[in-house]
Amino acid sequence: MARQGVIASMHALALLLGAFAAIPTGVQSIGVCYGVNGDNLPPASDVVQLYQSNGINLLRIYFPDANPLNALSGTSIGLIMDVPNTDLASLASDPSAAAAWVQSNVQASRRSACRYIAVGNEVSGGDTGSILPAMQNLNAALANAGLGGSIKVSTAVQSDVTQGFPPSQGTFSQGYMAPSRQYLQSTGAPLLSNVYPYFSYVGNPAQIDLKYALFTSPGTVVQDGSNAYQNLFDALVDTFVSALEENAGAGNVPVVVSESGWPSAGGDAATAANAQTYNQNLINHVGQGTPKRPGPIETYIFAMFNEDQKTGAESERHFGLFNPDKSPVYPINFS
């Protein structure tokens, strides 16, 4: 989920001052995260209809919630389903717990099109030691259920697991990421990356140009060898790519942007106009890819609704594309 604190690491500070070029169309894979931290949200069946009516073909949920899973049954909407951070230790230590999790949450809802299982979201501290064994146990459970390879198992991380500038110098700053990236390479799973130019900007507005964060600057900001960076999103994604490529055995791991967004109220630069600009430009841009990884980037916007019960900074409650009554917070076009 979107974070309360600023996660702009030093490499993001340096991706500054700047400019940007025309944004192409042609997005193939745009999704939206579906959070439920609200007391006034519509029923899941209405939510799935809202996805379908807007042409949104990918969805992320943060725990195996039976209501959206049932509503998704029989649709073609692709799904990321999270394992809550609180469940990691048991899944890491007990293969039978992983088997039970798969049976209850994947096999029981097999008519929903689950693409990825995210083993934790932005896990920190000592819990990071549970990520790899939990992924291993879940993959084994999927294989035993006859689902090996059809559902990829990964984990969702934020930008502060990387460091380095320019993007070509990106490395992982957290020790648990080295074995994780090699495991992802061995299974063919992507790294799920939460990418927020918003947090980088609000943490360093004197050094990072708002236009660079919003995809609206007129020229190159960072020249990194032959790669020209015209927006902060590309620079942050390619820092992940470089960190994966640092190990020759993990250079082919795909990057899926599992969260990105901009709040419409409640914080610095959090306006409906900026949120509309960022999210519409993101939709239009990700079909192009980044300088290091041309081609469509599967990307999930955070979030579907403004959620009045989210904790933390006021802006956390204003990342939604839609109000709880299903009216748009601002116009957005997914086509």
From Swiss-Prot:
Gene3D superfamilies, per the entry? Glycosidases (3.20.20.80)
Q: What induces it?
A: By pathogen infection.
Quick one: where is this thing mainly located? secreted
Alphabetical GO biological process terms: carbohydrate metabolic process; defense response
Q: Where are the transmembrane segments?
A: none
Per the record, the coiled-coil ranges are none
Tissue occurrence = Accumulates in aleurone layers. Much lower levels are found in the embryo, and none in starchy endosperm.
Q: Active site located where?
A: 122 (proton donor), 259 (nucleophile)
Q: Which UniProt keywords apply?
A: Glycosidase, Hydrolase, Plant defense, Secreted, Signal
The reaction(s) annotated as catalysed by this protein in its Swiss-Prot or TrEMBL entry are:
Hydrolysis of (1->3)-beta-D-glucosidic linkages in (1->3)-beta-D-glucans
Question: Which PROSITE patterns does the entry mention?
Answer: GLYCOSYL_HYDROL_F17 (PS00587)
The entry's localization annotation reads: Secreted, Extracellular space
Concerning PANTHER family, the annotation shows:
GLUCAN ENDO-1,3-BETA-GLUCOSIDASE BG1-RELATED-RELATED
The family this protein is said to belong to = Belongs to the glycosyl hydrolase 17 family.
Q: What is the recorded name of this protein?
A: Glucan endo-1,3-beta-glucosidase, acidic isoform
Organism equals Zea mays
Q: What is the lineage of its organism?
A: Eukaryota, Viridiplantae, Streptophyta, Embryophyta, Tracheophyta
